[in-house]
């Protein structure tokens, strides 16, 4: 039986998904990667096993760029062990944390405040928690998506930000970490453990939003998670 030729955008995206799934590293944005992320995020000594909040969050909050967090609704994308979800809750926010790593979420759920709800889901394919949200934050999920799925991410995630709300993101920095080009990734299916983005990349990808802050993460801020190989950006929704 001859399969139908590609004739829709969804079919094209799904075909490209198959290329990524066939690579040795696999598709780390797919639910099948739950075990990988659970092991990585609980590995003793791994930088991501920290309980510290991201440096940009603390900085933006002190500068008043996040708005009032007391009573705010927050969506924490790729929440992992819940360190940023916990920080938001400590500021008075009601938090929806989402991540692929169901075993990890089951382990950390009892340790988090009651105002944090954790849900295991695929940000690209599963229904997202009902918005709108005052703050949507992504610490390291976006840079693991295959290039063609950035389109899906933008179409699904940005509408969850309320008008006047905030969207914040942290990614690998293009000038600090090596990564393949999008063409190389699409050709080989290998996402190489994550992709890098320049500040201009972030500005362009999230064009529907208004930028408030684009900069490298400040590695000198104490009591925060602040590796020197990350870029960060904060936007507001019109």
Regions picked out by a protein language model, each given a short descriptive name:
Residues 2-128, 145-156, 166-238:
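Class I (Rossmann-like) S-adenosyl-L-methionine-dependent methyltransferase catalytic domain
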Residues 128-136:
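A short acidic, Gly/Pro-enriched loop at the edge of an enzyme's catalytic core
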Residues 138-139, 170:
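Short beta-strands and strand-loop turn motifs
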Residues 140-144:
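Short catalytic micro-motifs in class I SAM-dependent methyltransferases
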């Amino acid at each position: 039986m001859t399969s139908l030729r590609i004739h829709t955008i969804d079919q094209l995206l799904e075909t490209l998904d198959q290329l990524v799934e066939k690579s040795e590293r696999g598709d780390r944005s797919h639910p099948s990667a739950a075990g990988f992320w659970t092991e990585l995020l609980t590995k003793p000594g791994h930088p991501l096993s920290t309980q510290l909040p991201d440096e940009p969050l603390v900085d933006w909050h002190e500068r008043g760029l996040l708005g009032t967090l007391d009573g705010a609704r927050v969506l924490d994308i790729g929440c992992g062990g819940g360190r940023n979800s916990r920080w938001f809750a400590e500021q008075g926010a009601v938090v929806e944390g989402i991540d692929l790593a169901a075993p990890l979420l089951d382990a950390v759920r009892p340790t988090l405040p009651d105002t944090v709800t954790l849900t295991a889901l695929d940000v690209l394919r599963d229904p997202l928690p009902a918005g709108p949200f005052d703050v949507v934050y992504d610490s390291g999920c976006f840079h693991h998506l295959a290039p063609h799925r950035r389109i899906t991410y933008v179409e699904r995630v940005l509408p969850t930000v309320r008008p006047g709300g905030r969207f914040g993101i942290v990614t690998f920095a293009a000038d600090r970490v090596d990564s393949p080009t999008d063409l190389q990734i699409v050709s080989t299916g290998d996402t190489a453990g994550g992709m890098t983005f320049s500040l201009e990349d972030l500005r362009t990808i999230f064009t529907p939003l208004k930028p408030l802050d684009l900069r490298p993460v400040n590695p000198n801020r104490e009591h925060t998670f602040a590796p020197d190989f990350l870029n960060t950006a904060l936007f507001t929704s019109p």
